[in-house]
Amino acid sequence: MIKWPWNNSQPQVQTLEHWQAAISIPLLAPLSDEEHQKLAALADQFLKQKRLIPLQELLLTDIMQRRIALLFSLPVLSLGIGALDGFHEVLVYPGPFIVEEEWQDDIGLVHTGKMVQSGQSWDQGPIVLNWQEVQDSFDLSGFNLIIHEVAHKLDIRSSGEATGVPLIPLRDIAVWEQHLHSAMDALQEEIDLVGEDAASMDPYAVHDPAECFAVLSEYFFSAPELLEERFPDLYRCFQKFYRQDPLARLKSWQNNINYRAPSIY
């Protein structure tokens, strides 16, 4: 039973009911009652501080907004809402969207063209999502679009650009980079051996260090057992940075209740 830190007036009871429904997704099931309370409080702050802007006639219902806010708040559960101060707006498409992009090839030529994107995190601007893949982020599968984009914002806070190294003590940077690059090398070797489709983790992680940090942050929160098994040293680095231990949380939850995945309404 979740106990909520609100008084018993009618508007607050209504709010309580909304948060209970929004929290009922598999990703958040392992959190303790205390963590649910803290997460809901952070999500409430998030909704007061950020603008959620639906695009292409998407209707963002109350529970959709609350679930978006909860997923944004999960990676900063111990860091605090101030860690998300690098943006003010979240744009939400119904599904993957097309953008004009520039890229440089191996010989230095710059190309432009249209590309399909799932999400974007602009260095000095909003986060862009698509609701279809936000819904795919509700389970414990290793995929989480919002956590991926939040990781980019946390990365950018460190130096003003995404490098794969978030805001950590200087003494920890060398070890962080060593373990991150080691994970990239191991994943690249696996991809070379079995191909991208058969790889055990998302091959996008080998794109560059920033994407590796973002992709593996998804696993840290939604498939911690896999990340810890494959890259235990990097798991501990993430644990120290995020100040959370999702694997211990998951094991405790599995050991203390009869597992039944929450229904998504």
Curated annotation (Swiss-Prot):
Keyword Zinc: yes
Cofactor note: Binds 1 zinc ion per subunit.
This protein's UniProt keywords: Aminopeptidase, Cytoplasm, Hydrolase, Metal-binding, Metalloprotease, Protease, Zinc
Binding residues for Zn(2+): 111, 148, 152, 211
Pfam families (alphabetical): Peptidase_M90
Example GO BP: proteolysis
Compartment(s) where it occurs, according to its Swiss-Prot or TrEMBL record: Cytoplasm
Required co-factors: Zn(2+)
EC number per UniProt: 3.4.11.-
EC top class named in words: hydrolase
A single Gene Ontology CC term: cytosol
GO molecular-function terms, A-Z: aminopeptidase activity; metallopeptidase activity; zinc ion binding
SUPFAM superfamilies, per the entry: Metalloproteases ('zincins'), catalytic domain
InterPro entries for this protein: MetalloPept_cat_dom_sf, MtfA_enterob, MtfA_fam, MtfA_N
Subunit structure: Interacts with Mlc.
Family: Belongs to the MtfA family.
Cited function: Involved in the modulation of the activity of the glucose-phosphotransferase system (glucose-PTS). Interacts with the transcriptional repressor Mlc, preventing its interaction with DNA and leading to the modulation of expression of genes regulated by Mlc, including ptsG, which encodes the PTS system glucose-specific EIICB component. Shows zinc-dependent metallopeptidase activity.
Protein name as annotated: Mlc titration factor A
Originating organism: Pectobacterium atrosepticum (strain SCRI 1043 / ATCC BAA-672)
